[in-house]
Amino acid sequence: MTMTDPVADMLTRLRNANSAYHDTVSMPSSKLKTRVAEILKAEGYIQDWREEEAEVGKKLTIDLKFGPQRERAIAGLRRISKPGLRVYAKSTNLPHVLGGLGIAILSTSSGLLTNQQAAKKGVGGEVLAYVW
């Protein structure tokens, strides 16, 4: 069965594993999900990610990050642009998440970028998700 919104599925799996204090979470892999995982690692929200061979296709495994007393590195995730309602932002009107404490992940003509990277490059795009 095909998945309607793979990014929402990824964010939901991350949110559920994070709230249950799981150390890792696995999901079907794609280029888009891999790029989202790269951004989350670069911004310090996850410890690491890897792509593994599965019975069918590839599997993306993400190692979640916790503090010394098991504090969650990811406080929240929200899918913004959905298949039924796409949300776009111009380069002059990029979103700020929690006053700059969180990140927005955008799909731009330059690939997937955070709101800060998109502002530096002067590009806008589709707002995929907020992470804080």
Swiss-Prot record:
<protein>
    <recommendedName>
        <fullName>Small ribosomal subunit protein uS8</fullName>
    </recommendedName>
</protein>
<dbReference type="GO" id="GO:0003735">
    <property type="term" value="F:structural constituent of ribosome"/>
</dbReference>
<dbReference type="Pfam" id="PF00410">
    <property type="entry name" value="Ribosomal_S8"/>
</dbReference>
<comment type="subunit">
    <text>Part of the 30S ribosomal subunit. Contacts proteins S5 and S12.</text>
</comment>
<keyword id="KW-0687">Ribonucleoprotein</keyword>
<dbReference type="InterPro" id="IPR047863">
    <property type="entry name" value="Ribosomal_uS8_CS"/>
</dbReference>
<keyword id="KW-0694">RNA-binding</keyword>
<keyword id="KW-0689">Ribosomal protein</keyword>
<dbReference type="InterPro" id="IPR000630">
    <property type="entry name" value="Ribosomal_uS8"/>
</dbReference>
<dbReference type="GO" id="GO:0005840">
    <property type="term" value="C:ribosome"/>
</dbReference>
<keyword id="KW-0699">rRNA-binding</keyword>
<dbReference type="GO" id="GO:1990904">
    <property type="term" value="C:ribonucleoprotein complex"/>
</dbReference>
<comment type="function">
    <text>One of the primary rRNA binding proteins, it binds directly to 16S rRNA central domain where it helps coordinate assembly of the platform of the 30S subunit.</text>
</comment>
<comment type="similarity">
    <text>Belongs to the universal ribosomal protein uS8 family.</text>
</comment>
<dbReference type="GO" id="GO:0019843">
    <property type="term" value="F:rRNA binding"/>
</dbReference>
<dbReference type="GO" id="GO:0006412">
    <property type="term" value="P:translation"/>
</dbReference>
<dbReference type="InterPro" id="IPR035987">
    <property type="entry name" value="Ribosomal_uS8_sf"/>
</dbReference>
